[in-house]
């Protein structure tokens, strides 16, 4: 994974095929979460013990360790042209705090918040889903030079918003509520895995790696926007 750099008319970043597919999958899952209204978590956002990744061979550029982490997350990457709304998976009550973070109340007063929810949540949900799917489309079929992921000038806020929503979901799953918790997640992401690592620990390490990976990539975009 390479950070963003300025390019003609925008910004570009070169990613391995599996990295693009994986990030697109995270975006798709958040979009699915926004659209869900029943029970049963999206792949990869569940607590662990999923069916696992059924692929027998790693994708191009994907290491055996990367594949093991994705298998622990029960991750199934989307294909080009597939939208989040094409295969909805409903969200269980356990993910209610995540949805509340993505679609916050318009008021601290419970009665006012309930009254405003119908007016504010639907437009916000639509906005977030639209930008998530736009970013996902570029990741699956990049338009930059030599297959690089491209952000056209003027679309930066759309990308930052979409990436931030995914980070927010991952942070909630990791219980990150401050700098210390973020540092702990970073340490989990890069610590050497014990030989007897159980499924729960592997799942948490996978989510931590995802959070770390996405944070670094987003920060590379912010840095190039601020300093060139």
Regions found by a protein language model. Name each.
Residues 1-151, 156-228:
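Charged, alpha-helix-forming regions
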């Amino acid at each position: 994974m390479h950070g963003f750099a300025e390019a003609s008319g925008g910004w570009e970043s070169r990613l391995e095929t599996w990295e693009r597919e994986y990030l697109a999958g995270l975006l798709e899952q958040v979009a699915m979460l926004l659209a869900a209204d029943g029970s049963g978590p999206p792949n990869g956002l569940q607590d662990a013990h999923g069916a696992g990744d059924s692929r027998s061979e790693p994708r191009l550029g994907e290491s055996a360790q990367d594949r093991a982490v994705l298998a622990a997350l029960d991750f199934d990457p989307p294909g080009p042209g597939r939208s989040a709304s094409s295969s909805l998976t409903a969200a269980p009550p356990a993910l209610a705090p995540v949805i509340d973070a993505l679609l916050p109340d318009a008021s601290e007063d419970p009665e006012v918040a309930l009254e405003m929810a119908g007016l504010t949540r639907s437009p916000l949900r639509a906005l977030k889903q639209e930008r998530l799917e736009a970013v996902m489309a570029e990741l699956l079929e990049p338009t930059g030079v030599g297959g690089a992921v491209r952000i056209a000038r003027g679309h930066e806020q759309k990308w930052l918003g979409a990436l931030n929503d995914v980070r927010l979901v991952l942070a909630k799953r990791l219980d990150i509520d401050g700098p210390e918790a973020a540092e702990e997640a970073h340490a989990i992401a890069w610590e050497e895995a014990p030989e007897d690592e159980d499924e729960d620990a592997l799942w948490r390490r996978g989510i931590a790696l995802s959070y770390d990976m996405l944070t670094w990539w987003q920060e590379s975009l912010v840095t190039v926007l601020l300093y060139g």
